[in-house]
A protein has these predicted regions:
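Structural motif
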Residues: 2, 88, 110-112
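Glycine-rich phosphate-binding P-loop
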Residues: 2-26
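Short beta-strand-centered segment that lines the nucleotide-binding/catalytic pocket of NTP-utilizing
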Residues: 26-46
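Conserved NTP-binding/hydrolysis module of P-loop NTPases
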Residues: 47-65
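Switch II (G3) loop of P-loop NTPases
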Residues: 60-65, 81-99
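Short glycine-rich substrate-engagement loop in P-loop NTPases that contacts/grips substrate
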Residues: 64-75
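Conserved catalytic-core segment of NTP-binding enzymes
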Residues: 95-171
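C-terminal end of P-loop GTPase domains and the immediately downstream helical coupling element
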Residues: 169-189
Length: 189
């Protein structure tokens, strides 16, 4: 199973990715959550850990690490996704609907859409449909919110997650927990 975590920029995808990874690791019988960072934004797992310990140092390191999103990078990332063979693979992609993400996402099987702007969700849904990705969750990233909301769990998980901020442990949030259980369930089918 290869799940793309996608949506517009600055929605909190990397924060959600880290929270999901931690939540899944605590679930009994869960497969190892192999994460592919397929966007050169400088926010691998190291960034989340560094941001929790020293936010200023993490920002400085990210600025030094950040690279341009070239076609060559996208081709390499697409190969990582294509060749991923574990039971569960989570792919964190960049926040643009473009040919580079099309190349990377074309090797995935499922999608989780996270958006801080509800008006951008239909475009991401259409992009995923074009790539034959099964959308398993559509989540509104409510930065100003104070609580998660679960609207539906089937056939598509829908709701919101609040305050996705770098350096915050979001692994125990209700939306993260429900999504983690859903991903574990789907990966064992």
């Amino acid at each position: 199973m290869k799940v793309v975590l996608c949506g517009p920029p600055h929605s909190g995808k990397s924060c959600l990715r880290e929270g999901l990874k931690q939540a899944m690791r605590r679930l009994q019988g869960a497969p190892y959550p192999y994460v592919i960072t397929a966007c050169p934004d400088g926010e691998g797992a190291w960034f989340s850990e560094a941001a929790q310990q020293n936010p200023e140092l993490a920002r400085q390191l990210k600025a030094a690490y950040k690279a341009k999103f070239t076609l060559e990078f996208a081709q390499v990332a697409a190969q990582w996704v294509r060749d991923a063979s574990l039971a569960f693979n989570l792919v964190d992609v960049g926040g643009k609907i473009d040919e580079k993400n099309r190349l990377i996402m074309s090797h995935a099987t499922h999608a989780v859409i996270l958006a801080g702007d509800m008006n951008q969700i239909p475009a991401w849904q259409e992009f995923c449909f074009e790539l034959n990705l099964k959308i398993i969750a559509v989540i509104y990233s409510d930065y100003e919110g104070v609580a998660d909301q679960i609207q539906t769990e089937v056939p598509v998980l829908k709701g919101s997650i609040h305050y996705l901020e770098r350096g915050q442990d979001v692994s125990s949030r209700p939306m993260v927990q429900v999504l983690a259980r859903l991903l574990v369930s789907l990966s064992s089918v």
